[in-house]
Amino acid sequence: MSEIKKIATRDSYGNTLVELGKEHDNLVVLDAYLAGATKTGVFKKEFPERHIDCGIAEGNMAGIAAGLATCGKVPFMSSFAMFAAGRAFEQVRNSIGYPHLNVKIGATHAGISVGE
């Protein structure tokens, strides 16, 4: 039986985005000025042309992700859970949910720890 290695959830998220990026040329990662905290910076280092820093503007990030999805990209939005759910709710519902667009939302830091 192999040994199980513990890894922080956010580290796993960043590493998995890189693995998926190697397999899928249409994968794009967006973050809200949180590349270090959400570990999307790992993806940015590997694929700088497929990473978009949207600044502290989760609602706008949802709109950008929706636009990219309509053009055949598979966007991964990344932010703190509080802001991904709270600040971007209407844009996610109206621009992504209603038209059933293929957008993924990675919401980190949802609890009382950072997932170390």
Regions found by a protein language model. Give the residues of each.
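Thiamine diphosphate
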Residues: 1-116
